[in-house]
């Protein structure tokens, strides 16, 4: 059964456009989404409503990987991303839903994340910690203004 829910709120010093791109470009998401100690391989990403994605996180220490994939349900450029995803592992059953809302503010972008349907075998607090780590890495990707 899948009942866990995680909510996060951040303000990043970057435009909504830059953050939106970071969620939908394979090279960018592979850099920031995996929590500390994990690498990411993006196998497929078709970032359009009805499009699908597939990727895996590999624990660098143990070598174990968890593959997952999903479908983009709603994409409002620079404002909202909503997608479903599920793990390949039958021990991690159920479909999760994630909603990312972006809102411009005076110093950058307000970011709200809601992830629902987290499998019961994944402690919600561990999922929350993973998202916190990922969002720190996202900030390091999108906040710097580096000239060419």
Regions from the PLM with identified roles:
Residues 42, 141-148:
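Short, highly charged C-terminal tails/helix-capping segments
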Residues 13, 75-77, 105-107:
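Structural motif
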Residues 82-132:
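Beta-strand/loop substructures that line and gate deep hydrophobic ligand-binding cavities in soluble
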Residues 41-84:
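Glycine-rich portal/gate segments that line the openings of hydrophobic small-molecule binding cavities
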Residues 1-39:
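Hydrophobic ligand-binding cavity/cleft-lining segments
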Residues 19, 29, 53, 72, ...:
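Hydrophobic pocket/interface hotspot
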Residues 24, 135-143:
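Short amphipathic alpha-helical signal-transduction/dimerization elements
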Residues 3-9, 16, 40, 52, ...:
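Intrinsic-disorder/low-complexity, polar/charged segments enriched in Ser/Thr/Lys/Arg/Asp/Glu/Gln
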């Amino acid at each position: 059964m899948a009942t866990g829910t995680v909510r996060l709120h951040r303000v990043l010093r970057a435009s909504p456009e830059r953050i939106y791109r970071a969620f939908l470009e394979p090279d960018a998401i592979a850099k920031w989404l995996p929590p500390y100690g994990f690498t990411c391989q993006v196998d497929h990403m078709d970032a359009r409503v009805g499009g699908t994605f597939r990727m895996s996180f590999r624990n660098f220490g143990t070598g174990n990987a968890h593959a997952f994939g999903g479908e983009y349900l709603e994409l409002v450029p620079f404002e909202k991303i909503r997608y479903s995803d599920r793990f390949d592992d039958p021990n991690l059953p159920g479909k999760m839903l994630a909603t990312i809302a972006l809102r411009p503010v005076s110093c950058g972008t307000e970011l709200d994340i809601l992830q629902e349907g987290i499998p019961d075998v994944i402690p919600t607090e561990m999922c929350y910690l993973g998202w916190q780590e990922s969002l720190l890495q996202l900030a390091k990707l999108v906040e710097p203004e580096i000239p060419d």
